[in-house]
């Protein structure tokens, strides 16, 4: 993989010449630059409670996660969630082998339409997302108690003022997000 990662932010007023040059680099096949659409990301951050000024100053961390520099505690790999496995569980009435892991939502032979499958899948997803959030919350509490990260907290806005580490929710913005996988691009 090319390192360091290189990315650009684009919007409706991005100069054509700049986009043309970025596409020339992309054509080399190295996966760079990654392109991030301000017209999607800024409203999405505002929808999560980020001020417009902070949303406009977002940067990308990790692979693809937008956050506000010096203001965000983002645990972006909080879990790896296999959504294809949830489909398998759905098609087997909540079972994997002989173990009942999810709720009983009907055997696949009883489904008469794609809507039936989707309704069962939605129930399974609700069940597993609930348990995923509960598990992530437990880890959040353990991190706050056992790994407060004082040096990092001193570098993130509002932690000192609030008297809380980043692990305790001291940052202005606190996000936890699992990675969904098992899906085709």
Give the positions of each predicted feature:
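Conserved catalytic cores of very large enzyme subunits
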Residues: 1-185
């Amino acid at each position: 993989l090319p390192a360091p990662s290189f990315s650009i932010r684009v919007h409706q007023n991005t100069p054509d010449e700049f986009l043309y040059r970025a596409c020339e680099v992309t054509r080399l096949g190295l996966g760079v630059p990654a392109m991030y659409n301000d017209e999607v990301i800024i409203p999405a951050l505002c929808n999560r409670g980020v001020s417009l000024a902070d949303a406009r100053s977002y940067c990308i961390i990790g692979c693809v996660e937008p956050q506000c520099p010096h203001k965000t505690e983002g645990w972006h790999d909080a879990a790896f969630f296999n959504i294809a496995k949830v489909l398998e569980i759905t098609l087997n009435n909540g079972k994997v082998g002989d173990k009942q892991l999810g709720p009983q939502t009907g055997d696949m032979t009883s489904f008469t339409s794609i809507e039936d499958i989707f309704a069962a899948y939605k129930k399974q997803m609700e069940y597993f997302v609930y348990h995923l959030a509960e598990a992530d919350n437990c880890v959040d509490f353990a991190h706050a108690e056992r790994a407060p990260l004082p040096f990092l907290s001193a570098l993130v806005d509002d932690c000192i003022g609030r008297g809380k580490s980043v692990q305790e929710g001291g940052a202005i913005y606190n996000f936890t997000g699992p990675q969904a996988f098992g899906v085709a691009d």
